Amino acid sequence: MGTNKPVVIGIAGGSGSGKTSVTKAIFDHFKGHSILILEQDYYYKDQSHLPMEERLKTNYDHPLAFDNDLLIEHLQQLLAYKQVDKPVYDYTLHTRSEEIIPVEPKDVIILEGILILEDPRLCELMDIKLFVDTDADLRILRRMQRDIKERGRTMDSVIDQYVNVVRPMHNQFIEPSKKFADIIIPEGGQNHVAIDIMVTKIATILEQKVNL
Protein backbone atom coordinates (compact mmCIF):
# COMPACT_ATOMS: atom_id res chain seq x y z
CA MET A 1 0.00 0.00 0.00
CA GLY A 2 1.03 3.56 -0.58
CA THR A 3 2.48 5.75 2.11
CA ASN A 4 -0.08 8.48 1.42
CA LYS A 5 -3.82 8.42 1.99
CA PRO A 6 -5.98 6.60 -0.57
CA VAL A 7 -7.63 8.35 -3.52
CA VAL A 8 -11.40 8.74 -3.07
CA ILE A 9 -13.58 8.93 -6.18
CA GLY A 10 -17.20 9.91 -5.53
CA ILE A 11 -19.78 8.78 -8.11
CA ALA A 12 -23.29 10.20 -7.65
CA GLY A 13 -26.45 10.45 -9.76
CA GLY A 14 -30.12 9.56 -9.69
CA SER A 15 -31.56 6.08 -9.44
CA GLY A 16 -31.10 4.34 -12.80
CA SER A 17 -28.62 6.96 -14.04
CA GLY A 18 -25.86 4.45 -14.74
CA LYS A 19 -23.74 5.06 -11.63
CA THR A 20 -23.11 1.35 -11.21
CA SER A 21 -22.03 0.99 -14.85
CA VAL A 22 -19.55 3.86 -14.52
CA THR A 23 -18.29 2.48 -11.21
CA LYS A 24 -17.84 -1.00 -12.70
CA ALA A 25 -16.05 0.37 -15.77
CA ILE A 26 -13.52 2.25 -13.61
CA PHE A 27 -13.16 -0.67 -11.18
CA ASP A 28 -12.60 -3.16 -14.02
CA HIS A 29 -9.88 -0.98 -15.53
CA PHE A 30 -7.92 -0.99 -12.26
CA LYS A 31 -8.72 -4.63 -11.42
CA GLY A 32 -5.61 -6.26 -10.05
CA HIS A 33 -4.66 -2.96 -8.44
CA SER A 34 -5.50 -1.82 -4.91
CA ILE A 35 -9.11 -0.65 -5.36
CA LEU A 36 -12.47 -1.06 -3.57
CA ILE A 37 -16.09 0.06 -3.94
CA LEU A 38 -18.02 1.50 -0.99
CA GLU A 39 -21.76 1.82 -1.70
CA GLN A 40 -23.94 4.31 0.17
CA ASP A 41 -26.85 1.84 -0.28
CA TYR A 42 -25.29 -0.37 2.39
CA TYR A 43 -25.52 2.46 4.92
CA TYR A 44 -29.26 2.89 5.33
CA LYS A 45 -30.12 3.45 8.98
CA ASP A 46 -30.85 0.52 11.27
CA GLN A 47 -34.61 0.38 11.89
CA SER A 48 -34.80 -2.74 14.06
CA HIS A 49 -36.31 -0.66 16.87
CA LEU A 50 -39.32 0.25 14.70
CA PRO A 51 -42.42 -1.88 14.02
CA MET A 52 -42.74 -3.19 10.45
CA GLU A 53 -45.58 -0.81 9.58
CA GLU A 54 -43.25 2.11 10.34
CA ARG A 55 -40.35 0.60 8.41
CA LEU A 56 -42.55 0.23 5.34
CA LYS A 57 -42.94 4.01 5.25
CA THR A 58 -39.19 4.52 4.80
CA ASN A 59 -38.30 7.02 2.09
CA TYR A 60 -35.07 5.54 0.74
CA ASP A 61 -34.46 8.56 -1.49
CA HIS A 62 -34.29 11.09 1.37
CA PRO A 63 -30.94 12.10 2.93
CA LEU A 64 -32.22 11.23 6.43
CA ALA A 65 -32.59 7.56 5.41
CA PHE A 66 -28.81 7.18 5.36
CA ASP A 67 -26.46 6.66 8.29
CA ASN A 68 -23.86 9.03 6.89
CA ASP A 69 -22.20 9.32 10.29
CA LEU A 70 -21.23 5.65 10.10
CA LEU A 71 -20.30 5.95 6.42
CA ILE A 72 -18.00 8.89 7.17
CA GLU A 73 -16.47 7.03 10.13
CA HIS A 74 -15.75 4.01 7.92
CA LEU A 75 -14.38 6.16 5.11
CA GLN A 76 -12.04 7.93 7.52
CA GLN A 77 -10.84 4.57 8.84
CA LEU A 78 -10.18 3.33 5.30
CA LEU A 79 -8.28 6.55 4.59
CA ALA A 80 -6.09 5.64 7.57
CA TYR A 81 -5.59 2.17 6.04
CA LYS A 82 -7.72 0.44 8.67
CA GLN A 83 -10.19 -2.38 8.01
CA VAL A 84 -13.92 -1.69 8.49
CA ASP A 85 -16.98 -3.92 8.85
CA LYS A 86 -19.46 -2.73 6.22
CA PRO A 87 -23.11 -3.17 7.24
CA VAL A 88 -25.61 -5.06 5.08
CA TYR A 89 -29.17 -3.82 4.56
CA ASP A 90 -32.08 -6.26 4.33
CA TYR A 91 -34.70 -4.80 1.97
CA THR A 92 -37.23 -7.51 2.85
CA LEU A 93 -37.13 -6.63 6.55
CA HIS A 94 -36.47 -2.92 5.89
CA THR A 95 -33.66 -2.77 8.41
CA ARG A 96 -29.98 -3.53 8.82
CA SER A 97 -29.01 -7.19 8.72
CA GLU A 98 -26.88 -8.85 11.38
CA GLU A 99 -24.45 -9.72 8.60
CA ILE A 100 -21.34 -7.60 8.05
CA ILE A 101 -18.77 -7.53 5.26
CA PRO A 102 -15.12 -6.98 6.25
CA VAL A 103 -13.53 -4.41 3.92
CA GLU A 104 -9.76 -4.16 3.65
CA PRO A 105 -8.26 -0.73 2.92
CA LYS A 106 -7.06 -0.03 -0.62
CA ASP A 107 -5.23 2.74 -2.47
CA VAL A 108 -8.33 3.70 -4.49
CA ILE A 109 -11.80 3.99 -2.95
CA ILE A 110 -14.83 4.42 -5.20
CA LEU A 111 -17.70 5.85 -3.15
CA GLU A 112 -21.01 5.38 -4.97
CA GLY A 113 -24.49 6.60 -4.05
CA ILE A 114 -27.44 8.77 -5.01
CA LEU A 115 -26.82 11.36 -2.29
CA ILE A 116 -23.09 11.32 -1.56
CA LEU A 117 -22.67 14.85 -2.96
CA GLU A 118 -25.54 16.15 -0.82
CA ASP A 119 -23.46 15.83 2.38
CA PRO A 120 -20.59 18.36 2.51
CA ARG A 121 -18.75 16.16 5.04
CA LEU A 122 -18.52 13.40 2.44
CA CYS A 123 -17.55 15.85 -0.31
CA GLU A 124 -14.60 17.00 1.77
CA LEU A 125 -13.21 13.47 1.79
CA MET A 126 -13.34 13.04 -2.01
CA ASP A 127 -10.49 13.76 -4.40
CA ILE A 128 -12.74 13.65 -7.48
CA LYS A 129 -16.52 14.12 -7.50
CA LEU A 130 -18.53 12.75 -10.44
CA PHE A 131 -22.21 13.11 -11.25
CA VAL A 132 -23.77 10.72 -13.76
CA ASP A 133 -26.45 12.73 -15.57
CA THR A 134 -29.09 10.72 -17.44
CA ASP A 135 -32.47 11.67 -18.91
CA ALA A 136 -35.39 11.06 -16.51
CA ASP A 137 -37.27 8.86 -19.00
CA LEU A 138 -34.32 6.50 -19.29
CA ARG A 139 -33.83 6.43 -15.52
CA ILE A 140 -37.42 5.38 -14.81
CA LEU A 141 -37.26 2.66 -17.49
CA ARG A 142 -34.08 1.27 -15.95
CA ARG A 143 -35.56 1.41 -12.47
CA MET A 144 -38.71 -0.40 -13.61
CA GLN A 145 -36.67 -3.11 -15.28
CA ARG A 146 -34.50 -3.58 -12.18
CA ASP A 147 -37.28 -3.52 -9.57
CA ILE A 148 -39.63 -5.81 -11.50
CA LYS A 149 -36.95 -8.30 -12.52
CA GLU A 150 -34.69 -8.31 -9.46
CA ARG A 151 -36.99 -7.31 -6.60
CA GLY A 152 -40.30 -8.87 -7.65
CA ARG A 153 -42.14 -5.54 -7.75
CA THR A 154 -45.24 -4.85 -9.86
CA MET A 155 -45.19 -2.19 -12.56
CA ASP A 156 -47.92 -0.21 -10.79
CA SER A 157 -45.98 -0.14 -7.51
CA VAL A 158 -42.79 1.01 -9.25
CA ILE A 159 -44.61 3.79 -11.11
CA ASP A 160 -46.43 4.89 -7.94
CA GLN A 161 -43.15 5.04 -6.00
CA TYR A 162 -41.46 6.95 -8.80
CA VAL A 163 -44.19 9.58 -9.08
CA ASN A 164 -44.71 10.07 -5.33
CA VAL A 165 -41.19 9.56 -3.95
CA VAL A 166 -38.34 9.05 -6.40
CA ARG A 167 -39.01 11.96 -8.75
CA PRO A 168 -39.73 14.61 -6.08
CA MET A 169 -36.70 13.50 -4.03
CA HIS A 170 -34.51 13.59 -7.13
CA ASN A 171 -35.63 17.14 -7.90
CA GLN A 172 -35.31 18.30 -4.28
CA PHE A 173 -32.01 16.68 -3.26
CA ILE A 174 -30.15 14.75 -5.97
CA GLU A 175 -30.33 17.17 -8.91
CA PRO A 176 -29.23 20.19 -6.80
CA SER A 177 -26.19 18.22 -5.56
CA LYS A 178 -24.91 18.10 -9.15
CA LYS A 179 -23.41 21.56 -8.69
CA PHE A 180 -20.85 20.09 -6.28
CA ALA A 181 -19.47 17.68 -8.90
CA ASP A 182 -16.08 18.29 -10.51
CA ILE A 183 -17.16 16.38 -13.61
CA ILE A 184 -20.63 15.64 -15.00
CA ILE A 185 -20.90 12.48 -17.11
CA PRO A 186 -23.89 12.33 -19.47
CA GLU A 187 -25.17 8.95 -20.70
CA GLY A 188 -23.66 6.99 -17.82
CA GLY A 189 -21.78 3.80 -18.63
CA GLN A 190 -22.26 4.35 -22.36
CA ASN A 191 -20.02 7.42 -22.27
CA HIS A 192 -16.73 5.66 -22.95
CA VAL A 193 -14.87 8.90 -23.68
CA ALA A 194 -15.67 10.33 -20.24
CA ILE A 195 -14.77 7.04 -18.54
CA ASP A 196 -11.43 6.89 -20.36
CA ILE A 197 -10.67 10.46 -19.27
CA MET A 198 -11.51 9.55 -15.67
CA VAL A 199 -9.32 6.45 -15.77
CA THR A 200 -6.40 8.54 -17.04
CA LYS A 201 -6.97 11.18 -14.34
CA ILE A 202 -7.10 8.56 -11.56
CA ALA A 203 -3.93 6.90 -12.88
CA THR A 204 -2.17 10.29 -12.86
CA ILE A 205 -3.22 11.00 -9.26
CA LEU A 206 -2.01 7.56 -8.16
CA GLU A 207 1.32 8.10 -9.88
CA GLN A 208 1.74 11.49 -8.20
CA LYS A 209 1.03 9.98 -4.78
CA VAL A 210 3.59 7.23 -5.34
CA ASN A 211 6.22 9.80 -6.30
CA LEU A 212 5.60 12.05 -3.27
UniProtKB/Swiss-Prot annotation:
Its EC number is 2.7.1.48. It holds the Pfam family PRK. It is an enzyme of class 2 (transferase). Keywords: ATP-binding, Cytoplasm, Kinase, Nucleotide-binding, Transferase. ATP binds at residues 13-20. Its main location: cytoplasm. GO terms for biological process: CTP salvage; UMP salvage. The keyword Kinase applies. One of its GO terms (cellular component) is cytoplasm. It catalyses: uridine + ATP = UMP + ADP + H(+); cytidine + ATP = CMP + ADP + H(+). Belongs to the uridine kinase family. This is Uridine kinase. It comes from Bacillus thuringiensis (strain Al Hakam). The lineage of its organism: Bacteria, Bacillati, Bacillota, Bacilli, Bacillales.
